[in-house]
A protein has these predicted regions:
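Bacterial N-terminal signal peptides that target proteins for export
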Residues: 1-11
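C-terminal segment of classical bacterial N-terminal signal peptides
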Residues: 14-22
């Protein structure tokens, strides 16, 4: 049941992030904030409850599975999802509130955060992450 709740939360969070576009700037939308990786292949979304890394390409398999995400050298447990419900867009979600807050703190440690997900190193510019402070408490 907990896995199902995490999947549903990741889907809802992902759909909120998918509905807008931005490039290399942190943008707040409601209680969420998002940006793109430097290469534009990934969208990173944060909220008080989650951190989501979403590929801008289609995945092939249909699965929810346990995974990990590395942020500036710290490793977090995550859920990796590929589902037709999300248009086969691959998503890795930290749906645990404590882990999400810790991961967001890790993001803020460097001007160019290094996220290890999808077997790749994803570079994210965090210079203007403070734009999220009114939307995401962990950024304050």
């Amino acid at each position: 049941m907990k896995l199902f709740k995490n999947i549903v939360f990741a889907i809802v969070t992902t759909l909120a992030f998918v509905s807008t576009q931005a490039q290399a700037n942190w943008m707040a939308r409601g209680n969420n904030c998002y940006t793109y990786s430097e290469d534009g292949r990934y969208q990173i979304g944060i909220s008080d409850r989650s951190l989501v890394v979403m590929g801008q390409f289609q995945c092939r398999a249909h699965y929810p599975m346990s995974d990990t995400v590395g942020i500036n050298g710290r490793v977090y447990q995550a859920l990796n999802i590929c589902s037709p419900d999300m248009r086969l867009i691959p998503v890795i979600s930290l749906a645990n509130t404590d882990q999400a807050a810790s991961a967001i703190a890790s993001l803020k440690e460097a001007r160019r955060a290094r996220i290890r997900a999808f077997n790749e190193t994803i570079i994210v510019n965090t210079d203007d992450i403070q734009a999220c402070a009114n939307s995401v408490a962990a950024v304050r």
